[in-house]
From Swiss-Prot:
Keyword Signal recorded: no
The species this protein was found in: Archaeoglobus fulgidus (strain ATCC 49558 / DSM 4304 / JCM 9628 / NBRC 100126 / VC-16)
Pfam families in alphabetical order: DHO_dh
Family classification: Belongs to the dihydroorotate dehydrogenase family. Type 1 subfamily.
GO cellular component terms given for this protein: cytoplasm
Reaction equation(s) it catalyzes: (S)-dihydroorotate + NAD(+) = orotate + NADH + H(+)
Protein name: Dihydroorotate dehydrogenase B (NAD(+)), catalytic subunit
SUBUNIT field: Heterotetramer of 2 PyrK and 2 PyrD type B subunits.
Residues the record lists as binding FMN: S21, K44, S45, N125, K163, G214, G240, G241, G262, S263
Amino acid sequence: MNPLETEIGGLRMKNPLMLASGIMGSKVHSLNLIARDAGAVVTKSVGVEEREGYRNPTVVNWKCGLINAVGLASPAAKDFAEELKDYTNEAPLLISLYGHSVEEFSDLVDTFDSALPYLHGYELNLSCPHVKGAGLDIGMDLELSAAIVEELKGKTKNPVFAKLSAMHDYLKLAKVLEDAGVDGITISNTLRGMKIDIMSGKPVLSNLSGGVSGPAIKPIALKCVYDLYKEIEVPIVGCGGITSFEDVLEFIMAGARAVQIGSAVYYSRRIFYSLKESLIAFTRARDCTISDLIGIAHS
């Protein structure tokens, strides 16, 4: 028996370790490398049309993680669908979608459902903190967010997940999305922050501010998962600052059925293998499965 197997919204995974959206870019070769050891792969967020994103610098490394403002740079959906036809399918593939309206999200699902028969689901980006009119701006509109979920659930057989931010009333939004039929909630995306170059006296990022990720946001994301577990029935995916198997276990014990790894991949692409092996050793030593540990912090 595989002690790490888990399921979220009908999506069965060999382990609870998912690649978070964005960190590996939009080239399928990079996604295939991660799929060998990951439980699932979430792509970079993509919209209907190609988006150039912000000019450099777009990422800054600081002592507690990363701050990025890439600006949702991505190929057009149709081009990305062609790229993904070379995906090896060693782990379930989910497409991260961003848009500005119900119609845009609907068009995106039409594109990917028709092009990729082996697709396993979608994750709605309702939380990117640095692109006007998309991401967090959509997530702040409860009625629009619910309408997007209802539209997509009415047209695709694939699971639909939503990625939320800790920077707004995530409990209220999660409940609204649950009522709309969402299959799972991922929390949290990056949180707004910035860094200033003391020599020039100017912000380092070209966009001035960006999204903070890495260990600095882990306690915040962990509390979000803990809170949501008490309030919603749909599966929760924890995301934010996970760098060790102990971090993974904390999120699982708080109530997550799976976790996403992002910034840690920046430092080591072997992070999934390392975490997987450590989790296997932990569960075997205690004669338990990952599923046995879900939510035990509430006991």
